[in-house]
Each structure stands twice: as structure tokens, then as C-alpha cells.
């Protein structure tokens, strides 16, 4: 890392040294190698907020196990749209990572992505019926080839022994399993990407840590003047023709300071997260899967419970959660004044509308905050009946600042997902929101590049380069099973992931 530099100009500034900025910086360097890029991070190390391994679940979201991605439609059918969309977006990420591994710009993929089966697990006749219908709908689509289904307790016990340990009674159970799921250490991925960028000659890409962007204003030529304060009380200014705000929850404040009209009306609803974590080898060794179930009735989408295998720094662990909470901080290392400081005349009405229409969410968060350790482990026992309090400890996860935006009908809505807000001239863009986030970082950043650099993006030179980086885009993969299989075969080989298994006979 480098020290301070006075009154400099660069081509591109990225605020925040997480997986989004690392992905965008890598893309832009591949597309425009001569561009001077600086990444500015408030903390003393990179990938220390939302991208840090234990601040997120590490799920390579691909629509394989997330039941809230496949709702039952009004006509009784299962809607696959979101699952297919998420699946093909993750294929774009795997293609990009594979390219970087093949070119030596990423090291051993086993340091950041691991093959972990993705499972869905349900109890009770109604949910078993739902999962069975879901399986029949999904198994016909190439995105979900290899999905297995069972209502046989002995098979579920083979797939995930902890689910059956000590489970009594004859309650109907069902599960699906896809062997090609993944666990991703987004912190390790981010650090690898940034380390390779820093190796570029002549400080073509520079990463500064321990520095905070305090303000940003327009220059007369349309570029941006960025005021930066160091943790050592130094001050400097930096000029850039393009700025990306990828600072997690802090992006909203910076978007507001930019003054671009496109940012008016946006607000944030911060939700904290917690996990139960187990590191005991005798327990961890008996579970190799990410097992997702259904959220309780009335609970928000980010509350879907799951029992996961995690691989962090070469050490396996188990994670269960998430348990939500409420704080007024926008970052795990932020200030309790973050929410209050984000209130503007332009977003007050949407915020009040969301507060009026989401009382059940507020109640849910309050109830979650009040949970004792015993009560959290009780929830875990719906997955792992033999769970003991002393085997699990609480791990505080990162902050998720959900997007609040204007709505012509309701006044304001709460949006669970990510959103890019960009200036009309493409000189500044901010990433707001949360899940599925990091899994689809490549797709989000490709769309951002197209939005902010439309002429260059459409040029023959950039299109050819983009085809090298991500040969098959999501919209193409969704409708071309042969192409999807070919792409997966290559990426899974490069990333050392297991091959897709043939789809079994359907269960009736």
C-alpha cells in the first residue's frame, strides 16, 4: 500500500476495496490497460467489510437451493424466472474467474471457491408438495441439470447426516441436492484480484488504505474532485473523470454528497446480521452442504434459514442463520449516526412510507434482537436436532443496507437486492443494496460499464475483449442448453469444481 499524494489526477477512482471495486477495476484494466486507476479504502486493509468471509454467507447464489427464488404463481405453477436469471448471472462470474485463472491473474482457485452441494430441505406435507413441484419444474431446465430429489429419510441422511441425527417422529421430509453448488470466500477472491492489480508497472493501479473520501464535487470540465482524509490526519484532493462508489452502506452518503439528480429520493434501511458458528471437527466433518429451507411466514427474504459448510483460509466450519437485528449503522465499522445523516428532504417521504408499510419487518427485527443463545440454537435444531448450545458461538456478520426508493403508487418501497445509480453522463455510479450481491458481481459490473461507457462498450475493440473475458452472457445461456453445458464444462474444469451429474429419474 502507498502513502498520500497531493493534488493528483487519475482516470478512474473506485471508493471501497471490496469485491465489487476489485471486479470493476479488473474489468476496466482489461478493457483499457493504459487507464490510471486508484482504489480508496477507509479501513487499514482490503476486503474487511461486507466482502470479509465471515461477514457474508459465502453462497455462490445460483438459484439451486434458494426457495424464495422460485415462488408458486397464482395459477399454481412454479415460477423459475428469478432462479434462471440468478443461475446464468453466476455463470458469468465463473467465466470471468476462469479467464483470470487461465491468464495467471488469479492464483489457485481452491483458495477462493470450493465445490459444496446446494440443498433445499423442507418439512410438513404442504412444503413437501411445494418442493416436489419445484423439482419437477426445475429438472427440465438446463440450468438445473443434475438436481436430485428425495423424500426418503435414509437418502437425506446420506446427503446431510446432521439433518437426521436425533430426528424423531414421522413428519414428512423432502430435500433436493445439486452437487455443483459452491462456497465462495469473497474476501480471498478480492485480495487476490487486488494483489494482481497492484503488481502492474508504474503504479497503473494504486490501492490506498486508511483513507476516507469526505466529499466529491464536479469540476467545470465534468470530471470529479475528491476530497480525501487520511487516518494520519493528512488531507489531499484527487481528480478523476470517472468515479465508482462501491463502499457498501457508505455508498449512499457519498451518492448524496455528489449531488447528481439521479440519486435524489434514495434512502437506506440498515439490517444487521448474525450467525451461529461451529468449528468442532467431529461435527463439521459430518456436514458437507449448503442447506436452505423456507423463511417463517411474514419474515423478510434475507431471513431464509440455512445450515452451511464454509471454507475460510483452508479451515472448514459450519454456519447457521442468519439472525437479523437492527442498528442505525450503515457499516459494521460505521457510526450510529449513519441513518440520521442520510435523511434528506427528497427521501423523507419514501422513508416514512416504508415505515408505514413495513411494520411487520420492524417487529421481526425487534423479536430477533431479543433472542437468547438458547432460542437461536432452538431454531438451529429444526435443521440439526442434536445441536448443543456449547458447540456453537455467535458470529456478527456484516451490515446490509436495503434500498428505499420512490414509488408512484406507495410513495416509497423497500427493495431487497442491488441497484446501480448512475449520472446521466456516465461519470459517476454508485452501487446500493445487498443480496445476491457478490455472486453476481461480474454481471453487475459489466452492466455498469455498459451504462457508463456506452460508446466504448459498443466498439469492436471492447466487444472482442469482453468476449474473451466472458464468452457467453447470461441472456444467451438461459435459452441454449448446449452452450451452457459447454461453458460449465470449461469453467468447472478450470476452477476445479465437480462436474454436473446426470439428472435422476423424477420422483412421483
UniProtKB/Swiss-Prot annotation:
Keywords annotated in UniProt: FAD, Flavoprotein, Oxidoreductase, Tricarboxylic acid cycle
Cross-referenced Pfam families: Mqo
Needed cofactors: FAD
Enzyme superclass (EC): oxidoreductase
Catalytic activity reported: (S)-malate + a quinone = a quinol + oxaloacetate
UniProt pathway: Carbohydrate metabolism; tricarboxylic acid cycle; oxaloacetate from (S)-malate (quinone route): step 1/1
Oxidoreductase as UniProt keyword: yes
GO molecular function, one term: 2-hydroxyglutarate dehydrogenase activity
Xref: InterPro entries: FAD/NAD-bd_sf, MQO
EC number from the UniProt entry: 1.1.5.4
Superkingdom field: Bacteria
GO biological process terms on file: tricarboxylic acid cycle
Family stated for the protein in its record: Belongs to the MQO family.
Protein name as annotated: Probable malate:quinone oxidoreductase
Organism: Chromohalobacter salexigens (strain ATCC BAA-138 / DSM 3043 / CIP 106854 / NCIMB 13768 / 1H11)
